[in-house]
Structure formats: structure tokens, C-alpha cells
Amino acid sequence: NYMITILQARTRGMTLMRMPLTVWGIFTATVLAMLAFPALLVSAIMMTLDKVLQTSFFMPTILKAGEVLEYGGGSPILFQHLFWFFGHPEVYIVALPAFGIVSDLISVHARKNIFGYRMMVWAIVGIGGLSFFVWAHHMYVSGMNPWFGFFFATTTLIIAVPTAMKVYNWILTLWRGNIRINTVMLWCLGFIVTFVNGGITGIFLGNVSVDVPLSDTYFVIAHFHMVMGIAPLMVIMGAVYHWFPLVAGKMLHEGLGKWHFWITFLGAYSIYFPMHYLGFIGCLLYTSDA
């Protein structure tokens, strides 16, 4: 519905290169969902067959009454590939609409056209396309061939280029704009700061030699929650404060909105930012109680 509406039901004169960036983000995320979710569906079906019919897609061996049965060919690594082929585009299914929304909010509340509109569009499309070539950076410690690790580390760093372009364009849109530091703008600025912090930690985890000692530590928890938790939440709240008056015909309280932002921002950083240090000193996510 999203794809056909955007492609076929635009108003007269609304060309693709005139659409709001929010719509571009939703459109690209919809394409990613159409291509990525089948991998998750297939892996779920294969896992169900392994459990119910004792097939061997993911299970290399099976025990029955303490006896190893003839059961071969399965690989748990195959499940990881299928899951993460869905899992990493899913990050951008969440992030790309947020990128579009924050671009439009910054433009409105800086009272200035978004800097480099076409560049922003192609950055959204480029991020979406590259998201299908980076999934195995979640699997550096799975025993993959080092050349594959090198390939996925390279693509992971490449996808940072269009992402950085978007951040630069947001900053250049703010530059010399007639900025109103209201609640919506605070949420947008909080998103930029949080997303940049999360992106920097992502560079650590995208590098094979650094990721191996940091894998399964609290550093990963901090990175994930900054990028996939706090940053999108800030965009959602900014969008609510921006569009609620249009929907309800009432303005939300500006003073309470700023309190809401600062409690959320400082609270999130007080919880997740120290986890980077915990990861660096080797605090693991999982510890055996045996």
C-alpha cells in the first residue's frame, strides 16, 4: 500500500524529487521490508520443520535417549545468515523513516530549506541498498573466512559515507538558520547527538579486530540501544510534538515538553553511556552460573 500510494497516487505536480524526505524514508523502508522479511519467514519455517519433523536445516546432530541419531548436514550458522540478512536491513527499516522525519522537522523549525535535498534522497536510497551487504558484521566471531570478514568490514565502513552525508546536511541546514529552540528542535538535536554517538561506536564494532574482543559485551548493548532505542524514540517524540497540534487542534505545553526532553535525554545517557566503559573492561552480557 505504501509503495503503490507513493508511486501512483501522488498529487498533481508532486514529482518524486519534490516529495518530503519523510515520504522518501517510508518508501525506501517499505522496499527494504519487502525484500528482507522473506528471509526471516523462511528461517522460521525451516526452524519449525527442524523442531516438528526432525529435519536438519540448522541442527547438525540430535540426541534421543542419550543416543546420537543419524542426523547431518545442518548448520546453526545458516540460521545466523538468514536471520541477520533480515536483521540488519531491519535497522534501516526503523532508521530511514526517522531520517526523513528529522530532516523535515529541522527544516521547518530552522525556517530554512533542507540543505542538499537531492543528496539527502540519494543518501536514503544508498543506505537502503547497502544495508543488504553488511549483515555478516554481526557474525565476526562465528568462524567465518577472514576474507569474508574483510569484505563485510569494508561494506560496513562504506555505508557510513551516506549516513555521514545526512548528518552534515542536517548541520548545514541549521547553519545560519532562524532556529527556534523549542521542544521539537530539542528532540531533533538530541537525535543528532545520540545518532552520531551510536554511529561512532558502530565504527568500532564494524572493524573485525576491534569487534572480536568487544563481542558479547556491554559495549554492544550500549551501541544497540543508542542507535535502535534512544535515537528513534527522540524522533518519534519530536514528531508527536510537531504534528499533535495539527491532529488535535491543541498545542502541547512547551515547558513540560522541555522537561520531558531533558529527563529522557539525561536519563538515557546516564544508563547507557557508562556501558561503553563496561564493555571496554570486558563485562560480558552472559556469564555461566555453573
Where are these regions (language model features)?
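Generic hydrophobic alpha-helical segments
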Residues: 13-15, 178, 273
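Short amphipathic alpha-helical coupling elements at transmembrane boundaries
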Residues: 5-11, 173-176
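Membrane-interface helix-loop-helix junctions at boundaries between adjacent transmembrane segments
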Residues: 7-25
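Conserved small/polar residues in nucleotide/adenosyl-binding loops
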Residues: 286-290
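Hydrophobic cores of alpha-helical transmembrane segments in multi-pass integral membrane proteins
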Residues: 1-5, 22-73, 79-108, 117-140, ...
